[in-house]
Amino acid sequence: VRSRGLGDVYKRQILLCMVFARNAAMGFNRWADRDIDAKNPRTAGREIPAGKITPRAALAFVIGNCVAFVAAAAWINCLALWLSPVALAVLLGYSLTKRFTAWSHVVLGLALAIAPVGAYIAVTGSIALFPMLLAVAVLTWTAGFDILYSLQDASFDRSNGLHSVPARFSAVHSTLISILLHVLAVAAVAVLGALYRLGVWYWVGFGLFTAVLVVQHVLYRPSRIDRIGASFGLVNGLASVSYAAMSIVALLTA
């Protein structure tokens, strides 16, 4: 919303940064985890284990997108350029964290939390409290749902020496940790709305976001891990899209 005064080329560079960063992160995850994915029945059909893409081609894709991301960041402003290697370190580093820490979910949350901060830097050339609060919400929301998603791989992770919250703790305790993180996410979203007086439409989005998180924890209880699948992504997509849409409406009508 703050970018309404920017030129089309400038907006295009911000969009390209998002695409290149996501391509690099997803590609590196598939490349780094190719041997692990081949052992897991849930992921054995992914492109590299299935032989659809060679590891060398995947790595070339990652490198190309990393270079393109830095170049696009340089076009935006100096602060974006200087921070682009930090962003890439977090985005790519996440894929290695399951090898040594159960809290890889938090690193994934941090990787996604970079997005609102990066977008704010791209538009304003500075860092402020507003995007930081939004980043906290994204981090805790993402870490919370990733813990739930990882419940289905808990046994595999334990048997293969991989680390995750579900692999370390019981399903019940993992779910409680997820709930706590989602409470923090809801709190961050509420503080953001109250602090900046974002209006009624924002609070509609807040209500929808909170409701979807509650429904998620009702649907995916420890006793119903089998429900986690394609619908899991849809549920979390509804949470983010509804909150984002209502927030944009609130800012446009303020």
Question: What is the predicted role of each segment?
Answer:
Residues 108-121, 168, 233-247:
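Small-residue-rich segments of transmembrane alpha-helices in multi-pass membrane proteins
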Residues 16, 46-134, 214-221, 227:
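Intramembrane alpha-helical segments
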Residues 191-254:
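Extended hydrophobic alpha-helices typical of membrane-associated regions
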Residues 11-18, 130-141, 202-205:
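Alpha-helical transmembrane segments
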Residues 1-10:
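Single conserved hydrophobic/aromatic residue that forms the stacking wall/gate
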